[in-house]
Amino acid sequence: MRIIGIETSCDETGIAIYDDEKGLLAHKLYSQVKLHADYGGVVPELASRDHVKKTIPLIKEALKEANLTSQDIDGVAYTAGPGLVGALLVGATIGRSIAYAWGVPAVPVHHMEGHLLAPMLEDNPPPFPFVAVLVSGGHSMMVEVKGIGEYKILGESIDDAAGEAFDKTAKLMGLDYPGGPLLSKLAEKGTPGRFKFPRPMTNVPGLDMSFSGLKTFTANTIAANGDDEQTRADIAYAFEEAVCATLAIKCKRALEQTGMKRIVIAGGVSANRRLRAELEKLAKKIGGEVYYPRTEFCTDNGAMIAYAGMQRLKNGEVADMSVEARPRWPIDQLTPIA
């Protein structure tokens, strides 16, 4: 079975073709970073218009890369949510339309389920069950995963997601868009221990998280200490340390609560090297294991959508003729796959 995956939930247009026997046959990704850079963030209308321009050409490129034609495709998977409604509608409309034109089934895919299953694209995929640390620009949550579609949210951010906190703090520090990766790069030059940032909500029971206060703490630290280059690097170090330590503390509690020892890190922030190091240290301490996708599959991409869609199509899930876009869609509402 060969599935083409379409990802347009935010500011990346991702197209991929996945074969259940041969694996990934093609992977195309276009980022809109330059388009939104002048605005300091994603402009939804511009994102939607750019997806309209890029999706069909990328589909053609993916077919060419895989040396396939539309007649070789057995199904279409498209991101139906959560995300920006206009951007989602572009991918959903194109996905549903080409499925109809090609005479194959289509299936809507949950964006975060795609991220959660992205490590399955690797040579050493994680076996079920595990605790997933899903961290991106729009979501931060701890999820108990017993199988595909068997998700229980153990805790989530009550305000800013981790990736959002990185980007907002970077903007506060005068870094260009997208700021999260630039903040992490600046943190590499930081002095450990000069500043100590709080670990939000780690002094209370439960697994919910809060990261918005760290932005205020950063602003106050800059005001009190100046913003010369080394001070900025030291502040970036302390901020990143606080976010990663908080996630590690919450993950440890999630493992204790579930009795599990396997950790999956997924979503855009899963590319962060310090976060990976913190969770690897935790896993080593408890005799567990950590799994994460290669860097190119941490960001939004079509490969994870093609893979997740294949699992859904094999389970008999097929969309009707309507075009489905769900900007809000709790991951624990998905149907388990037997």
UniProtKB/Swiss-Prot annotation:
Q: Which InterPro entries match?
A: ATPase_NBD, Gcp-like_dom, KAE1/TsaD, Peptidase_M22_CS, TsaD
| GO CC terms of this entry | cytoplasm
Pfam families recorded: TsaD
- Keyword rRNA-binding set for record: no
Q: Which CDD domains match?
A: ASKHA_NBD_TsaD_bac
* E.C. no: 2.3.1.234
Q: What is this protein called?
A: tRNA N6-adenosine threonylcarbamoyltransferase
Could you tell me the gene encoding this protein?
Answer: tsaD
